[in-house]
């Protein structure tokens, strides 16, 4: 048995990372320490005045582990890795795990292209971003392609020059046709360098060039060309207006501010590139309002910059953060150049930080209003559920199940969880049928519930660390009527459980209409909050099942399609799908884009391109 007080005496006087676990062996907190002995002992001192969240965490700790490292920076990096791996309950977690989009100009190619990417590499290309929205990137790229008549096809230049006829875009004067020699390599590259200067914020140069061309065309009485150039100037001005200059030094910065109400914390990030705000992002941390802001910001920065691929030279903060020197060293190592963390005291930066903080406050207010509306629906819906079904109390954990299949193939099930009336996405589970070989909703539902509940039994008996099925439902909802409910009840009772089970029945138009419970069917009126609540659960369960089914079908299609290509094995297939997301995108990619994928050489890229083209 783990004796916490005895183990505290054994802690070393060194830097490292500590891992707190509960009675089930689940990791509930990960932290780092300059001196492990001092930091970990602080948690268990009765005189310590810990915030409520820390007190709750300590009350759950049954054992701890630690890992010794050589430096604070190593400890910080390991802490970030373990938080990402375990997603501990009591750590501040970023729910958004996306990679931000960038605009990439492939100056490393003879005929550069402009494209969207989510990977920044040292490959000789120029990258601009990050942008907070893929739509913003697509709009900018589309505008630039129209303004500069760039090629949009996947022809490999200079290899394909003169091999095919010019496309429709050329005849519509929307492409310079480098594939036909309509513009030579040096001219095309110079134009792409202009685009890079444009993306870097140097709009005036391009506008002046276009204005000179417009005036020349007008003097030569070529009014059609002059009008086209005038329209281009207008488009560039409109695009530049969306990225106002804030700083004349044209530095890259991230501005981080925050706002908190009585319960929640909102952190907002403004991305400043070349002196212009190109985007922003916000993060809501529920229940974190009372945390020390230095700790909260420090934790956020470590997680946020673990995920992003580009780190600016300066990070401007609303207030001081814990471990600022260590974080700056880590970010400097990550970027390869010096990164500074700065809390401004005067000047324009103070005004901008205040603006970011105000935006965080507005975002938090809107979040609270939306929560209030949703909470009303959920709380009223839950109250009606309790009354309608005659339950003793509101179910704290609802598990909802649905089946999805394409004929007799790719039969899958989803398990969606709502805790205290709200979706708990980290608790969602997906199942691929093992014993069902043809369409059979009842059999599929029974297999799903058997595997889910049997796994829970096994985890409890074996004391599984980081158990994923140990939490049990207060109410099970199945997509269907009385037959589905009976099929589910049979499995539940066979395994020795006595959960409440209800069916979510739909009408002929596939809309939620009633609940089936204990042999009775309860119609749900259209104005009932309960109908909106059950519909939300049913739609979410259906969405997860359908998306999983689609993903498996895509994998099967990939196997049959990509297996025909020489040099493509399992590892390369996975890498291609991870990068492009679909076979359709792979089919459209050119050789250079294919080579961006890990493990895809020029030879393999040519094999793929030639197979599809």
From Swiss-Prot:
Keyword Ribosomal protein: no
Location(s), subcellular: Cytoplasm
UVR domain segment(s): 204-239
GO molecular function: DNA binding; excinuclease ABC activity
BP GO terms, sorted: nucleotide-excision repair; SOS response
CC per GO annotation: cytoplasm; excinuclease repair complex
InterPro entries in UniProt: GIY-YIG_endonuc, GIY-YIG_endonuc_sf, GIY-YIG_UvrC_Cho, Hlx-hairpin-Hlx_DNA-bd_motif, RuvA_2-like, UVR_dom, UVR_dom_sf, UvrABC_protein_C
Statement: the UniProt record of this protein carries the keyword Lipoprotein: no
Ranges annotated as spanning the membrane: none
Chain ranges of the GIY-YIG domain: 13-92
A Pfam family recorded for this sequence: GIY-YIG
Keywords carried by this UniProt record: Cytoplasm, DNA damage, DNA excision, DNA repair, Excision nuclease, SOS response
NCBIfam families tied to this protein: PRK00558.1-5, uvrC
Function summary: The UvrABC repair system catalyzes the recognition and processing of DNA lesions. UvrC both incises the 5' and 3' sides of the lesion. The N-terminal half is responsible for the 3' incision and the C-terminal half is responsible for the 5' incision.
Family to which the UniProt record says this protein belongs: Belongs to the UvrC family.
Subunit structure and binding partners: Interacts with UvrB in an incision complex.
Protein name: UvrABC system protein C
């Amino acid at each position: 048995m783990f004796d916490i007080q005895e183990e505290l005496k054994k802690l070393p006087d060194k830097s490292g990372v500590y891992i707190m676990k509960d009675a089930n062996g689940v990791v509930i907190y990960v932290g780092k320490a300059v001196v492990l002995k001092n930091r970990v002992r602080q948690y268990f001192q009765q005189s310590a005045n810990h915030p409520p969240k820390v007190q709750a965490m300590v009350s759950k700790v049954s054992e701890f582990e630690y890992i010794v490292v050589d430096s604070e920076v190593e400890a910080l990096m390991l802490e970030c890795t373990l938080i990402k791996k375990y997603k501990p309950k009591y750590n501040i977690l970023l729910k958004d795990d996306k990679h931000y989009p960038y605009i990439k100009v492939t100056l490393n190619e003879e005929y550069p292209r402009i494209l969207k990417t989510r990977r920044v590499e040292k490959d000789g290309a120029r990258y601009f971003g990050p942008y907070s929205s893929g739509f913003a990137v697509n709009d900018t790229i589309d505008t630039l392609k129209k303004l500069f008549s760039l090629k949009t096809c996947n022809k490999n230049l200079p290899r394909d020059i003169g091999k095919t006829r010019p496309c429709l875009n050329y005849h519509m004067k929307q492409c310079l046709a480098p594939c036909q020699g309509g513009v030579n390599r040096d001219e095309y590259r110079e134009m792409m360098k202009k685009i890079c200067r444009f993306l870097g914020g140097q709009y005036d140069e391009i506008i002046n060039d276009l204005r000179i061309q417009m005036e020349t065309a007008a003097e030569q009485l070529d009014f059609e060309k002059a009008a086209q150039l005038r329209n281009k100037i207008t488009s560039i001005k409109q695009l530049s207006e969306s990225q106002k200059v804030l700083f004349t030094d044209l530095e890259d910065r991230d501005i981080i501010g925050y706002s908190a109400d009585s319960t929640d914390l909102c952190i907002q990030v403004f991305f400043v590139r070349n002196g212009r705000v190109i985007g922003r992002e916000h993060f809501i941390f529920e229940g974190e309002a009372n945390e020390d802001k230095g700790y909260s910001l420090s934790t956020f920065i470590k997680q946020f910059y673990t995920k992003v691929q580009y780190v600016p030279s300066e990070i401007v903060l609303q207030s001081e953060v814990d471990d600022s020197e260590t974080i700056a060293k880590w970010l400097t190592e990550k970027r390869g150049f010096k990164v500074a963390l700065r809390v401004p005291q005067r000047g324009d930066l103070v005004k901008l930080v205040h603006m970011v903080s105000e935006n965080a406050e507005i975002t938090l207010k809107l979040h609270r209003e939306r929560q209030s509306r949703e909470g009303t629906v959920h709380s009223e819906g839950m109250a009606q559920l309790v009354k309608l079904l005659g339950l003793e109390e509101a179910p704290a954990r609802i598990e909802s199940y649905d089946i999805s299949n394409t004929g007799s193939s790719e039969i899958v099930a989803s398990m969606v969880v709502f805790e205290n009336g709200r979706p708990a996405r980290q608790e969602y589970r997906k199942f691929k049928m093992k014993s069902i070989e043809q369409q059979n909703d009842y059999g599929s539902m029974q297999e799903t519930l058997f595997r889910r509940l049997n796994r829970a039994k096994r985890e409890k008996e074996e004391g599984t660390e980081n158990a994923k099925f140990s939490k049990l439902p207060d109410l099970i909802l199945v997509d269907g009527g009385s037959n589905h409910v009976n099929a589910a009840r049979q499995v539940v009772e066979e395994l020795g459980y006595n959960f409440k089970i209800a069916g979510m029945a739909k009408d002929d138009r596939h809309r939620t209409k009633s609940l089936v419970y204990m042999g009775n069917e309860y119609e749900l009126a259209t104005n009932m909050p309960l109908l909106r609540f059950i519909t939300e659960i049913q739609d979410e369960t259906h969405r997860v099942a359908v998306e999983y089914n689609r993903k498996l079908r895509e994998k099967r299609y990939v196997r049959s399609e990509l297996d025909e290509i020489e040099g493509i094995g399992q590892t390369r297939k996975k890498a291609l799908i991870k990068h492009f997301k679909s076979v359709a995108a792979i089919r459209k990619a050119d050789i250079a884009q294919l080579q961006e994928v890990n493990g895809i050489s020029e030879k393999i890229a040519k094999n793929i391109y030639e197979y599809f083209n």
